[in-house]
Amino acid sequence: MENRWQVMIVWQVDRMRIRTWKSLVKHHMYISGKAKGWSYRHHYESTNPRISSEVHIPLGDAKLVVTTYWGLHTGERDWHLGQGVSIEWRKKRYSTQVDPGLADRLIHLYYFDCFSDSAIRKSILGHIVSPSCEYQAGHNKVGSLQYLALAALTTPRRIKPPFPSVTKLTEDRWNKPQKTKGHRGSHTMTGH
């Protein structure tokens, strides 16, 4: 029988970012209690030698699985050291891969009482408005004018440590254009 290949989307991530992600997940699972129902699987609990860890996040009757890998082929850059992350949404026997932005929105939808979802309606009805959303990574668009006005009136409180964001885990901070320092008209800036 011939080999059968299965292709998965894996975002290349540096190992320090993966360590930070794991640390935040464990903190909110065991200390703050905000990640109730989440489960963390260590590398020795998996049959795949490339899997470093798995975080299972229940979303109703489905779940989101964030898998970190090690020992992958290195990328084209020196800092791509064979670490990676894949994000999968599973429900019964069906599974599909999702992008980090959608993963953050799903986590936000199931785990947080959000200011933007209910603030406008509550304020019109005269109810007390929750001043902020604890999971800002779940927001990726500009809100309505009403939302922006209410957001300007309330002061959001910062939560330390922040809740782990899948988008932040997979963002490409290495390939962002670098700003060169120098005086106006300098040779380094203009290239002349």
Curated annotation (Swiss-Prot):
<keyword id="KW-0833">Ubl conjugation pathway</keyword>
<feature type="region of interest" description="Interaction with host APOBEC3F and APOBEC3G; FG-box">
    <location>
        <begin position="54"/>
        <end position="72"/>
    </location>
</feature>
<feature type="modified residue" description="Phosphothreonine; by host">
    <location>
        <position position="155"/>
    </location>
</feature>
<feature type="modified residue" description="Phosphothreonine; by host">
    <location>
        <position position="188"/>
    </location>
</feature>
<feature type="modified residue" description="Phosphothreonine; by host MAP4K1">
    <location>
        <position position="96"/>
    </location>
</feature>
<feature type="binding site">
    <location>
        <position position="139"/>
    </location>
    <ligand>
        <name>Zn(2+)</name>
    </ligand>
</feature>
<keyword id="KW-0832">Ubl conjugation</keyword>
<feature type="region of interest" description="RNA-binding">
    <location>
        <begin position="75"/>
        <end position="114"/>
    </location>
</feature>
<keyword id="KW-1043">Host membrane</keyword>
<keyword id="KW-0479">Metal-binding</keyword>
<feature type="binding site">
    <location>
        <position position="114"/>
    </location>
    <ligand>
        <name>Zn(2+)</name>
    </ligand>
</feature>
<dbReference type="GO" id="GO:0016020">
    <property type="term" value="C:membrane"/>
</dbReference>
<feature type="binding site">
    <location>
        <position position="133"/>
    </location>
    <ligand>
        <name>Zn(2+)</name>
    </ligand>
</feature>
<feature type="region of interest" description="Disordered">
    <location>
        <begin position="162"/>
        <end position="192"/>
    </location>
</feature>
<feature type="modified residue" description="Phosphoserine; by host MAP4K1">
    <location>
        <position position="165"/>
    </location>
</feature>
<feature type="region of interest" description="Membrane association">
    <location>
        <begin position="171"/>
        <end position="172"/>
    </location>
</feature>
<feature type="region of interest" description="Interaction with host APOBEC3F; F2-box">
    <location>
        <begin position="74"/>
        <end position="79"/>
    </location>
</feature>
<comment type="subunit">
    <text>Homomultimer; in vitro and presumably in vivo. Interacts with viral RNA and Pr55Gag precursor; these interactions mediate Vif incorporation into the virion. Interacts with the viral reverse transcriptase. Forms cullin-5-RING E3 ubiquitin-protein ligase complex (ECS complex) by interacting with host CUL5, RBX2, elongin BC complex (ELOB and ELOC) and CBFB/CBF-beta. Within the ECS complex, Vif interacts directly with host CUL5, ELOC and APOBEC (APOBEC3F and APOBEC3G) substrates.</text>
</comment>
<dbReference type="GO" id="GO:0020002">
    <property type="term" value="C:host cell plasma membrane"/>
</dbReference>
<protein>
    <recommendedName>
        <fullName>Virion infectivity factor</fullName>
    </recommendedName>
</protein>
<keyword id="KW-0862">Zinc</keyword>
<keyword id="KW-1035">Host cytoplasm</keyword>
<feature type="site" description="Cleavage in virion (by viral protease)">
    <location>
        <begin position="150"/>
        <end position="151"/>
    </location>
</feature>
<feature type="region of interest" description="SOCS box-like">
    <location>
        <begin position="151"/>
        <end position="180"/>
    </location>
</feature>
<comment type="similarity">
    <text>Belongs to the primate lentivirus group Vif protein family.</text>
</comment>
<dbReference type="Pfam" id="PF00559">
    <property type="entry name" value="Vif"/>
</dbReference>
<dbReference type="InterPro" id="IPR000475">
    <property type="entry name" value="Vif"/>
</dbReference>
<dbReference type="GO" id="GO:0003723">
    <property type="term" value="F:RNA binding"/>
</dbReference>
<keyword id="KW-0946">Virion</keyword>
<dbReference type="GO" id="GO:0030430">
    <property type="term" value="C:host cell cytoplasm"/>
</dbReference>
<feature type="short sequence motif" description="HCCH motif">
    <location>
        <begin position="108"/>
        <end position="139"/>
    </location>
</feature>
<keyword id="KW-0945">Host-virus interaction</keyword>
<keyword id="KW-0597">Phosphoprotein</keyword>
<keyword id="KW-0014">AIDS</keyword>
<feature type="binding site">
    <location>
        <position position="108"/>
    </location>
    <ligand>
        <name>Zn(2+)</name>
    </ligand>
</feature>
<keyword id="KW-0694">RNA-binding</keyword>
<keyword id="KW-0472">Membrane</keyword>
<dbReference type="GO" id="GO:0046872">
    <property type="term" value="F:metal ion binding"/>
</dbReference>
<feature type="compositionally biased region" description="Basic residues">
    <location>
        <begin position="176"/>
        <end position="186"/>
    </location>
</feature>
<dbReference type="GO" id="GO:0019058">
    <property type="term" value="P:viral life cycle"/>
</dbReference>
<feature type="region of interest" description="Multimerization">
    <location>
        <begin position="151"/>
        <end position="164"/>
    </location>
</feature>
<feature type="region of interest" description="Interaction with host APOBEC3F; F1-box">
    <location>
        <begin position="14"/>
        <end position="17"/>
    </location>
</feature>
